[in-house]
A protein has these predicted regions:
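Flexible, glycine-/basic-rich loop-and-beta segments that form/coincide
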Residues: 196-243
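Conserved S-adenosyl-L-methionine
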Residues: 31-125, 137, 162-164, 207
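Class I SAM-dependent methyltransferase Rossmann-like catalytic core
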Residues: 24-31
């Protein structure tokens, strides 16, 4: 999708900013402002100007603080498990509706939001949510799955997530997502994008999904993996779109 690519173009051009970013691949507390602004720019290109926006795992509210003027009429919601970070976010952004609890404990109605945006928690662990327990989703995949239920048909889920969502051998979570949403675009971040703060080179992706009006049985290319010339297995989307 051209609007997504246009909005995220500077992610590639300004990689030097990542080395200075105090970011973490384990939570959304310190997402790089470069990444945040690029994601919002893509959403602006899609025409998002009003409605309800949710940031799950909002930390102290970095996405809230960088929301562009063009989206000033939106209603911003946030969820944060950590009580200290949650209280800071509530103090900084008093007009926003911020819940200090686990995402799995929230009870927002389905199709309530126009957009979900954020840096979801990464990790090889699960949370308990009766609606999703049978799928055994890892934490990052769970956040995406629940977010898709919370946005309206036509709504967008824009997240920074572990590359495991797109690259894991088992395609079950991708099939779950594909049944419910179209992949508008994806950007693989440099594997050192968050290294200075997190002391790790975990690979992460920015993914944009648009919720379908009805369930689909399509099997898009990004359900599957492909082997690169170097012998690595990566998602077919990235193999076909190396740019």
């Amino acid at each position: 999708d051209r609007s997504v690519s246009r909005g995220l173009g500077d992610v590639y051009k300004r990689q030097e900013e990542y080395s200075a970013a105090r970011a973490s691949t384990l939570n959304a507390f310190y997402t790089s402002p470069t990444v945040i602004r690029s994601m919002y720019e893509a959403l602006e290109n899609m025409g998002l100007k009003q409605g309800n926006i949710l940031e799950p795992s909002c930390g102290v509210g970095n996405f809230m603080g960088l929301i562009p003027e063009s989206m000033s009429k939106t209603n911003m919601y946030g969820v944060e498990l950590d009580p200290v970070s949650g209280r800071i976010a509530k103090q900084l952004y008093q007009k926003n509706k911020i819940a200090v609890q686990g995402f799995e404990e929230t009870s927002y109605p389905d199709s309530f939001f126009d957009c979900v945006i954020g840096n979801v928690p990464f990790g090889a662990y699960q949370v308990s949510d009766r609606r999703y327990d049978r799928h055994h989703f890892m934490i990052h995949d769970y956040f995406i799955a629940k977010s898709l239920d919370l946005v309206r048909p036509g709504g967008v889920v824009a997240v920074v997530t572990s590359s495991g969502t797109m690259d894991k051998q088992n395609p079950a979570v991708r099939q779950y997502i594909a049944n419910r949403a179209e992949l508008l675009g994806a950007i693989r971040l440099p594997n050192n994008a968050f290294q200075r703060n997190a002391n790790t080179s975990v690979v992460s992706d920015i993914l944009f999904f648009q919720k379908r009006d009805r369930a689909s049985i399509e099997e898009p290319e990004w359900l599957n993996l492909k082997e690169t010339q170097e012998g690595y297995s990566v998602n077919a989307y990235f193999a076909e779109h190396p740019e």
